[in-house]
Amino acid sequence: MTPARDALQVKAMFDRIAPGYDRANTVLSFGMDRSWRRRAADAAALRPGGAALDVACGTGQLTLQLKDRVGAGGRTVGLDFSQRMLDLARAAHPVIEWVEGDATNLPFEDSSFDAATTAFGLRNLADPEMGLTEMRRVVRRGGHLVVLEFLRPPGGLVGRAYELYLRLALPRLGGWVAGDRDAYRYLSDTVDTYMNGAQLLELAAGSGWGDTRLVPLNLGTVALMSGVATG
C-alpha cells in the first residue's frame, strides 16, 4: 500500500471504531488509561489562561484534562483526522475548539500554543518525526511537549507476557468491546513493531525538542515522554 492509501485506511478504521473507542480503551488498559492521561496533562505544565493543543485527540479525553488546567480564560484545541471521533468529542464538550486536520501539517501559526500533547496517536502517523516537528513549530519557546505512547514490548518475562497480550488478547477484546477485531489487530501490530524508549527520545530531540525525558509506566509498556521548546 502507498502511504496515502495507508493513511486513508487508518482514518476509515478510526471512524469505524469511534463509538466504542473510549470504552475499549478503559477495558484494554484495565482502567489505567485515565490516570495516564491525568499525568500527561500535569506534565504539560499549563497555567490558567494558557493555550493547549492536543494532537490526534480522538474523542477528547486528554483534551478535556488540558481544558481543566487552562480554565475558562484559556484556549484548548483538539485536532484529529477522524471526523467521527471529532463529532463525538464536539457533542460531549462543545466549549472546546475541535479541528479536523493533519498532524503532519498543522493548520496553526508558529508559536501559537504553550503546550502540545498527543496520547497514543504518534505511532499512527505516516511520519511521526514530521508530527513532532510540527508540534515544535506551533509551541512557543519554553513551552512543553507531552507524548503518551505504547512502547515496543520490553525484554524478560514482562515483555513476553505483554507480547502475548498484544497478539492474542487485545484483538479479541477489541472485537468484543468495539465490534472490530481487525482494527485492534492493526493497533496491536503497530505497538509490537514500534520504537523503544531510547528511539522515541532520539526522535523528539531530532525534531527540535530539548530537555527530553521519558517516564516508563505500566512496567515499561507505556511511555510518558516530555520535552521543552528550546532554541
Residues covered by each model-derived region:
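C-terminal alpha-helical "lid/dimerization" subdomain adjacent to the S-adenosyl-L-methionine
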Residues: 8, 148-203, 213
